[in-house]
A protein has these predicted regions:
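A conserved FAD-binding loop/helix module that cradles the flavin
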Residues: 233-258
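Glycine-/small-residue-rich beta->alpha transition segments that form the dinucleotide
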Residues: 27, 31-38, 86, 180-193
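Single conserved hydrophobic/aromatic residue that forms the stacking wall/gate
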Residues: 1-11
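Active-site-proximal substrate-binding core of FAD-dependent oxidoreductases
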Residues: 115, 255-263
Length: 263
């Protein structure tokens, strides 16, 4: 109604560089999200029956559509261990239960009060039968070719980090092995800075999040005046509603920028 148009698969074309793309418009908004999986960095993550959270959830959604998904990950009658403590981990917990998993554990290296997932999601997961393993640090996924168990070490919490969260410290000689059929890695996601960021004056912080020019009068403007950004690639993994809110604010910033430029 307001004259917007959408073009998919444009960025996959090799004949359009970002420089050329940028020169085609008065301003560009980057909302590329955080889609790089965070790994645990321990042995066994590449075994069969170990799944990253997003492909697992996506395969389940696609399988509910009219055409069944050839890559559908079905955990019916399986004993599942979900590693992680955010909302994505909660989604994996409850999806596995709805698929008919025999047992679902959710292991997190801190205690419940330090869990990043929403309290409501944790409460709902408990009510549906998820067994939480608090203060448990995974150190190895065990198996020959496929996952058969996860080795954990107990943790205790010490001083807080820069974000105010207590730091888990492994308790010596506290090893525990829990058998399973499948493991889901739900450690969260991180940004994936592109090679063309630097040459276009798009600066990032130490973990790859795009930096916004906080002294600019235009909301969500980067150090390149034509480029705006928001959502997960600026603040880190968060909720869809937060990204939508920042997108709206950035749109207002872009309108103000273009109007001032054309005066």
């Amino acid at each position: 109604q307001v004259g917007s148009s959408a073009a998919s698969d444009v960025y996959k074309r090799q004949d359009i560089s970002f420089d050329k793309f940028l020169n085609m418009f008065d301003a560009v908004f980057l909302g590329m999200g955080t889609y790089t999986y965070m790994k645990g960095g321990f042995p066994g993550e590449n075994l069969d029956c170990v799944y990253d959270s997003l492909p697992y959830l996506n395969s389940n959604i696609r399988n509910l559509m009219q055409k069944k998904d050839n890559e559908y990950i079905n955990l019916k009658d399986k004993t599942v261990i979900v590693l992680g403590g955010g909302d994505t981990a909660m989604d994996c917990n409850r999806t596995a239960l709805r698929q008919g998993a025999k047992k679902v554990y959710c292991a997190y290296r801190r205690n419940e009060s330090n869990m990043p997932g929403s309290k409501r999601e944790v409460k709902n997961s408990k009510e549906e039968g998820i067994e939480f393993l608090w203060n448990m640090q995974p150190v190895e996924i065990i198996g020959d070719q496929k996952a058969t168990a996860v080795k954990f070490m107990k943790t205790k919490l010490k001083k807080t980090d820069i974000r105010g969260r207590e730091i888990p410290v492994i308790v010596p000689n506290s090893e525990k092995i829990i058998k399973c059929d499948s493991v889901i890695l739900a450690f969260g996601f991180r940004p994936n800075p592109q090679s063309w960021f630097k040459e276009n004056k798009i600066f990032t912080d130490e973990i790859g999040r795009v930096k916004i020019n906080n002294i600019s009068k235009y909301a969500h403007q980067t150090n390149n005046p034509k480029i705006f950004s928001g959502g997960d690639m600026v603040r880190g993994s968060d909720l869809v509603v937060t990204a939508v809110f920042e997108g709206r604010n950035a749109a207002k910033g872009i309108i103000d920028y273009i109007n001032d430029k054309n005066k």
